[in-house]
A protein has these predicted regions:
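Conserved G1/Walker A P-loop phosphate-binding module
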Residues: 2-150, 407
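Conserved Switch II/interswitch segment of TRAFAC-class P-loop GTPases
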Residues: 155-174, 187-202
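Membrane-interface alpha-helices
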Residues: 327-355, 398-415
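Charge-biased C-terminal accessory regions appended to nucleic-acid-, cytoskeletal NTPase
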Residues: 371, 380-460
Length: 460
C-alpha cells in the first residue's frame, strides 16, 4: 500500500522536546554571558508573563450532564404549563392556541417510539456517501432522517447525531458537540478515513479524539469508518528482488457504525425519546417566556420613562450635585420597586433603596456618570437651540442614567427564572454586566442626540 508522509503527533512531540532542550542549553550559556543583571531582567520578564497569564479569563469548567429521567422531563413539561398560565393571567387576549396545543401533545409523545437522526459534516460528499450506505443496510428505515445543514431548528429535532469528520476535531466542532450534549442529544463521532493519512496515522487521530471528548462521550462512541471506495496500490516482492505491482479496490467499511446504531436502537430508544420530549418542552417554555417578556416590557418601559422625566425635573430644579444625587437615588428606588412588581420580584422600598445605592456605586465605578455627563454637556453646547443654562446638563444626565438603570433591570429580570412564589436575590455581577451592555448600546452620539431632544421639553 502506498504511504503518504505526514507530520505525526509523536514525531512532532519528539522534535519539540529536542528543540526545548537545545533552547534551554543556549539560554543557559547566554545567561552566563549576560551576567547578573541579564538574569534579573529575564526573571522580571518571566514574572510579568506569569502575572499576565493569571489575569486572563479562565474558560468555565464544562458541566457533564447525567442521563435524563422521566421525573425531569415531567418537570420541564410542568414548567412550560406554568409560564403559559402566567401569560394568560397577565394578558388574557394573547393568542396561545398553538403553544398550548403543542404543550398538550407532549405527554403523548413519551409513548411515541419514533426517533430522528441526522449527519453533521463539513463535507457534503462524505455525508451523502455515508447516508446512502446506511440506507442500503436498512438502518435508516428505523430513523426519520432529517437534512440539518445549518438550520438550528432542524438540529434541535435530532435525537441522534452522527458527527462525521475526516481529521481532528476543531474547537468550533467541539463546542457544537458540547451544545448537543447539553441538549440531551445522543452523539456519535465518526472519523472517516482520508487519503491524507495512512492507517497508522488515522488510528493516532482516533485515539486523540477519544481522549479529548471522554468527559461526555464514551470511547466506543468514537468510531473509525471508511464511507468511500478506495484504490490501493499493492507491491509484492519476489525472492530475486523483483516485484509485481497492481491496484486493489478497498470497499467502504462502516460495520462498526452499523453495529453501534443497532445497539442504540435496541437499548437506548427510551433515552432518545426522553431527550426529544425534554427539548420540545424547553422550546415551548422559551417561546412562552419570550411572549411574557414582551408583555412585561411593554408595561415596564412607559413606567421607566415616567421616572426618568421625574429624575430630570428633580435634578434640573436642584442643580447642586449632592441634592441631585439624593433625589435621583430616591426616584430610582421607587422605580426599582415598581419594576420588580411587574416582573413578580416584589422588592420592598428598603430593598429598592439598597439596590438603587448599589446601582449608583456601580455606575460611578464604571465611569458612566462622568462619561454621560461630559457627552451630554458637549451635545448641549454644540447646539445653541437646545442649550439651556443652569441645570440642563444635570437634568438630562439624571434622566439618562435613570433610563440606563431601568433598562438594565428590565434586561436582568428578563433572564431570571420565572418563579412567582419565590423572590430571588439580586446577582450584582450579572447586573453590572447588564449596565455595561445597556450603556454601550445607548451611548452612541445619534442615540444621545435623540434623547437630549426628547428630554429638553420635559425641563420647560
Amino acid at each position: 500500500m502506498m504511504r503518504v508522509k505526514v507530520k505525526k503527533p509523536i514525531l512532532v512531540a519528539g522534535l519539540g522536546i529536542s528543540f526545548l532542550l537545545w533552547l534551554g542549553e543556549s539560554l543557559h550559556e547566554q545567561a552566563i554571558a549576560m551576567g547578573e543583571w541579564g538574569v534579573l531582567s529575564l526573571m522580571a520578564v518571566g514574572t510579568g508573563v506569569w502575572w499576565w497569564q493569571k489575569k486572563q479569563p479562565q474558560k468555565p469548567a464544562y458541566k457533564t450532564l447525567s442521563p435524563l429521567t422521566i421525573t425531569e422531563v415531567n418537570q420541564a413539561i410542568s414548567e412550560g404549563k406554568k409560564i403559559l398560565k402566567i401569560v394568560k393571567q397577565e394578558d388574557s387576549n394573547y393568542n396561545l392556541v398553538e403553544l398550548e396545543t403543542q404543550w398538550k401533545n407532549l405527554p403523548q409523545k413519551l409513548n411515541n417510539q419514533s426517533v430522528s437522526w441526522g449527519i453533521i459534516s463539513n463535507s457534503n460528499t462524505d455525508k451523502n456517501s455515508l447516508k446512502q450506505l446506511l440506507e442500503k443496510e436498512k438502518i435508516a428505515d428505523n430513523f426519520n432522517y432529517l437534512e440539518s445543514e445549518d438550520d438550528e431548528n432542524v438540529k434541535q429535532k435530532l435525537d441522534l447525531i452522527v458527527f462525521l469528520i475526516n481529521t481532528d476535531l476543531t474547537e468550533s466542532q467541539w463546542q457544537m458537540i458540547q451544545k448537543c450534549h447539553q441538549n440531551h442529544q445522543r452523539v456519535l463521532i465518526s472519523l472517516n478515513q482520508s487519503e491524507q493519512y495512512n492507517t497508522e496515522e488515522q488510528e493516532i487521530i482516533l485515539q486523540e479524539i477519544k481522549q479529548r471528548v471522554k468527559t461526555i462521550i464514551q470511547s466506543d462512541d468514537v468510531i473509525g469508518i471508511n464511507s468511500k471506495q478506495k484504490i490501493i496500490k499493492v507491491r509484492q516482492y519476489k525472492e530475486d528482488k523483483s516485484y509485481q505491482e497492481w491496484n486493489e479496490t478497498q470497499p467502504p467499511n462502516i460495520l462498526a457504525l452499523i453495529t453501534k446504531l443497532d445497539s442504540i436502537l435496541s437499548q437506548e430508544r427510551e433515552k432518545l425519546i426522553l431527550g426529544k420530549v425534554w427539548r420540545e418542552a424547553q422550546k415551548i417554555k422559551q417561546q412562552a417566556k419570550v411572549i411574557l417578556n414582551k408583555i412585561r416590557r411593554d408595561r415596564a418601559v412607559p413606567m421607566m420613562e415616567k421616572y426618568q422625566w421625574i429624575a430630570a425635573a428633580a435634578a434640573f430644579a436642584n442643580p447642586v450635585s449632592s441634592l441631585d444625587l439624593l433625589a435621583t437615588a430616591a426616584i430610582n428606588a421607587q422605580m426599582i420597586v415598581d419594576l420588580s412588581s411587574i416582573y413578580q420580584q416584589k422588592f420592598t422600598l428598603s430593598q429598592g433603596q439598597t439596590i438603587a445605592a448599589t446601582i449608583g456605586k456601580l455606575m460611578i465605578k464604571l465611569g458612566l456618570v462622568e462619561l454621560s455627563t461630559h457627552a451630554i454637556s458637549s451635545l448641549l453646547k454644540s447646539n445653541a437651540i437646545t442649550y439651556v443654562a443652569g441645570g440642563a446638563t444635570q437634568g438630562i444626565s439624571a434622566a439618562y442614567l435613570t433610563r440606563v438603570a431601568g433598562l438594565s433591570l428590565v434586561e436582568y429580570f428578563q433572564e431570571q427564572e420565572i418563579n412567582p412564589n419565590q423572590n430571588q436575590s439580586l446577582d450584582i455581577e450579572k447586573l453590572s454586566t447588564k449596565i455595561k451592555q445597556v450603556f454601550e448600546q445607548t451611548k452612541r452620539t445619534e442615540i444621545l442626540q435623540g434623547f437630549v431632544k426628547q428630554t429638553i421639553p420635559q425641563l420647560s
